[in-house]
């Protein structure tokens, strides 16, 4: 079904791109650009939906490989620093004990990406912080913001697959993002905790057990 859904969308995008190259004058060019942007958004939504169902059905398995925790933190900082600055927010990044661990790097980055994206999205003043710490075989990743925060009821709904926040300022809600992240954390054998207060911001804490790669694969602390 993945192939059946993606093929026609790929065709629409492809033919529209060809049309854009041949007809790029006046309003026609803008109309075609709008079609391309809408197709891109639809593709992203489709990929997100398919990702959710794969994880929810237990069909996705971790792809473990050695990676340095600070490399994950650096990737997230590089991506979100300009996003925060452009919105007038501060982004604080702190990395505790660094280590080379055996984990699914792309999924860990996806978790951090989702948390930071929501934190920036729902914060209008103040800032966002990212903290990573590795201790006793457990990676702790914390994202905290000074944003709108959530009521107790909204916190209960936050990880639901199709729940939306009722706050008008957050009318786009979390969508499937947090539901997917919850499933990713579960797939990796971890836990996620939400602490929030309306008008005071939110704090997400993810804890995932993982072994140091050097214990199994002979990596040293100087391995890139």
Which residues does each predicted region cover?
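Short conserved segment of the HATPase_c
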Residues: 150-162
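Short acidic helix/loop segment immediately C-terminal to the autophosphorylated histidine
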Residues: 20-26
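Conserved catalytic submotifs in the C-terminal HATPase_c
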Residues: 63-68, 85, 90-99
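Short alpha-helical segment of the dimerization/phosphotransfer core of two-component systems
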Residues: 37-45
